[in-house]
């Protein structure tokens, strides 16, 4: 009993440190858009998308790689998932994940997600309409996570990730980790989760594309050109602290909410609900920006609203489990509304467990 009490005390102490770290680096309007690795902010997993990323307290299975790694501890069998989604501006988002238990309390999972931008016409200062050739950026995130059940109520997890971005002849790479905790109150039907995400190194682009051939300043006419290398700025990853709560209204319906405290953009609040009946589930949610900062002088109310409100609206999703002998095949679909500028984000996912 004393061991459990000491463990819980350590967990709460860790959570307090995470909260203080996040609040001390909380984002404002002035820092919005200055973080690198924005692909890390794209929600992944049908249930996570459908609930507007509000399900961190109750996330489970291999999908927890992208929401709260503590949920990896719920994996009891070999399982995996693959999904493909239409993101903004004809960008394809593909994901593969696989997980398995190592023993009775510890699990391991790995995943990779790739952004496919297609072929983009190559332009330059001399060929602003394109020179007839194309290039295709390569963005991916590779992850390896561990989950562990401390008790029947407490789960913890950690995920290490490699973030890679390549555009033509320049590239950038960063390393990051996610840390998560989930706590359940069975008698109260309450779930609480905390996840510190994308804590890692800074990203800086480099490569032959940063090189230029110029005449040195202050030299005499006829001086030969020299090669110069431009040093790109290095930027931090979009670190965030997600504090989430889930409450089961009954055996079929759960409501969820999550507050995302970002370091380099406006904080957000997400709410959602999931209803499941037998082997079918339905989910819906929405997210909103939580303003932090005063309206800029001279900015109209309309411009201020456009500047501070979320680009995303409601989200919905559904899925079904199909028993195949001793295995389970799951098929799910989710959609996230884009308020303007781009098409909605939709994703089709297939998962298995055996």
Feature-to-residue mapping (PLM):
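Cleavable N-terminal export/targeting peptides
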Residues: 1-38
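Short strand-turn segments of transmembrane beta-barrel domains in outer membranes
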Residues: 53-56, 78-87, 336
